[in-house]
Amino acid sequence: MFSKYKKKILFSAVAGALIFLAFSVYADFDKLLDAFKEFNWLFFPLILVLSFLNYIFRFSKWEYYRRILDIKLTTGKSFLIFLSAFVMSVTPGKMGEVLKSYLLKEENGTPVSKSAPIVVAERLTDFISIVFLCIVGAFVFDYGQTIIMIVGVVFISLTLLISWKKACLYFISLLEKIKFLSKHVEKFHTAYDSIYRLVRIKPLLIATVISVVSWFFECLGFYIVLNVFSSATNIEVSLLTATFIYGFSTLIGAIAMLPGGLGVTEASLTGLLQILKIPKNISVASTIIIRVATLWFAVVVGIFAVIIYQRLTHRDLEEIQVPNQA
């Protein structure tokens, strides 16, 4: 891991712990412990497996993009690089995952300007897919339609704008006239060439379908959490409702641009569950369980992947120069 990111990751971990503590106080700590006792922990490994399936499908999207851009790499190293970036899951909008580009550069000299657009394309298709997962539930649940529609329109419009080659090349030509940017124009052209190839209709549709499937696995994990608790609450939550609540909460957490959506996602999950009349302690327990099984599990997977990558490649990632911004 990188020294300059260690403090950020540690800060996010502390912030996450404090948020869990605050929610524990909100739910009444003793009642929260009772809720955890009600949960059948034999289902927890299954929820982790579903989260990992999310990672596998997202990796397939990464591989699909990598092949479109003709970036040569063995599947094994590509998988380790992909998972290593999960340590950056607690950076705003997950954009710290551009770490993948720096590792690719170390492996085969691929310019960051060529591969970094993959991260942008990943985020675009993630947003579009989550909107797709949420949209039906929003109208059934009668909540959040406006936010979801706005986010959907914004990201679809952004994708269409990126695919408007003439306009984008004209914009880049304007950058050439700005003195301190003119020296980077070649990189801008390289980056645009990559992102343009990734957002064409066929790659966009394929990547979005992969994203829908991958994020549905985590929605399914949340559904299992709620149904394990149903014996204690006597409230059956449909898969459609669970998908909406998890997807919507993930969406606004990402929009907030806070590290890992910390605080915002948890508040949304808990609040929406309480709208369903699920007791406060069960709502908070469900939120903590799914966040540990998704966000924090991803960070742990990323840490192990970084360790394995360093040992296999004999590279010290501390020595890789990366920008200070996540």
Where are these regions (language model features)?
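Hydrophobic alpha-helical transmembrane segments in multi-pass integral membrane proteins
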Residues: 190-191, 257-260, 270-289
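Short intracellular "coupling" helices and adjacent cytoplasmic loop segments at the cytosolic face
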Residues: 83-98, 103-106, 195
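Predominantly cytoplasmic-facing regulatory/coupling regions of multi-pass membrane proteins
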Residues: 1-82, 140, 144-253, 295-326
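Re-entrant/interfacial helical elements at transmembrane boundaries that shape
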Residues: 95-107, 256-275
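Transmembrane alpha-helix interface/packing and boundary motifs in multi-pass membrane proteins
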Residues: 84-93, 245-266
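Membrane-interface alpha-helices at helix entry/exit sites of multi-pass transporters
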Residues: 75-78, 95-99, 110-121, 279-289
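Membrane-embedded alpha-helical segments of transport systems
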Residues: 87-92, 114-138, 252, 289-300
